[in-house]
C-alpha cells in the first residue's frame, strides 16, 4: 500500500480549508484517509498547524509528500523538510558513488580486454 501525505479539501465554496492527511494513493482527493497530520487555512492569520513528529514518522516509514504538501511542510516544519532533503542527497551520493565504481570496473575490463 503506497502512502502519500497530501492536502484534503474541506470547507465551503468560497472559503476552502485544507487538511494535511496521510492517505492511500488510490483513495480519492476528499476520500478516506489514515491519519490527520495538520490543517491549512489560506484565509486566516494563523493559517496552518502541523504535527511535525507524526509527519517525520510517516516520511521515515516511506510515505511521500505531494508537491503542495511539501511546500506547506517546508514552510511549517523546516527541520523535518531539511532532514528529508538531507536523506535524499545522501541516497543520491551513494548511488552516484556506486555508478562511478561500476564505470571504473567496466573501463578496467575494457582496457584489459584491449591489452590481450
UniProtKB/Swiss-Prot annotation:
Does the UniProt entry include the keyword Ribonucleoprotein? yes
Coiled-coil stretches, from where to where? Answer: none
Q: Which InterPro entries does its entry note?
A: Ribosomal_bS16, Ribosomal_bS16_dom_sf
Pfam families the record matches: Ribosomal_S16
Q: Name one GO molecular function term.
A: structural constituent of ribosome
Q: Which UniProt keywords apply?
A: Ribonucleoprotein, Ribosomal protein
Q: Which GO biological process categories is it annotated with? A: translation
Identify the GO cellular component terms for this protein. Answer: cytoplasm; small ribosomal subunit
Q: Does the keyword Ribosomal protein apply?
A: yes
Q: In which family does this protein belong, per the annotation?
A: Belongs to the bacterial ribosomal protein bS16 family.
Name under which the protein is recorded: Small ribosomal subunit protein bS16
Classification of source organism: Bacteria, Pseudomonadati, Chlamydiota, Chlamydiia, Chlamydiales
Gene symbol of the encoding locus: rpsP
Amino acid at each position: 500500500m503506497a502512502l502519500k501525505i497530501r492536502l484534503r479539501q474541506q470547507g465551503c465554496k468560497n472559503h476552502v480549508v485544507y487538511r494535511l492527511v496521510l492517505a492511500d494513493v488510490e483513495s480519492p482527493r476528499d476520500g478516506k484517509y489514515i491519519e490527520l497530520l495538520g490543517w491549512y487555512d489560506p484565509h486566516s492569520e494563523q493559517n496552518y498547524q502541523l504535527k511535525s513528529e507524526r509527519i517525520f514518522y510517516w516520511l521515515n516509514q516511506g510515505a511521500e509528500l505531494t508537491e503542495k504538501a511539501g511546500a506547506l511542510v517546508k514552510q511549517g516544519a523546516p527541520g523535518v523538510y531539511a532532514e528529508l532533503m538531507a536523506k535524499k542527497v545522501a541516497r543520491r551520493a551513494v548511488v552516484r558513488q556506486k555508478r562511478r565504481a561500476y564505470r571504473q570496473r567496466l573501463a578496467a575490463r575494457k582496457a584489459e580486454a584491449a591489452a590481450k
